[in-house]
Amino acid sequence: CSCADMTDKECLYFCHQDVIW
């Protein structure tokens, strides 16, 4: 996935959750 703001911890958190699951 990709986050509009790569410094957005919440976005990155859910992004990585999606990768894991």
Curated annotation (Swiss-Prot):
GO terms for biological process: regulation of vasoconstriction; vasoconstriction. GO terms for molecular function: toxin activity. Signal peptide: none annotated. Keywords: Cardiotoxin, Disulfide bond, G-protein coupled receptor impairing toxin, Secreted, Toxin, Vasoactive, Vasoconstrictor. It is found in: Secreted. Disulfide bonds join 1-15, 3-11. The record marks 21 as: Endothelin-receptor binding site. The keyword rRNA-binding does not apply. Expressed by the venom gland. This is Bibrotoxin. Belongs to the endothelin/sarafotoxin family. GO terms for cellular component: extracellular region.
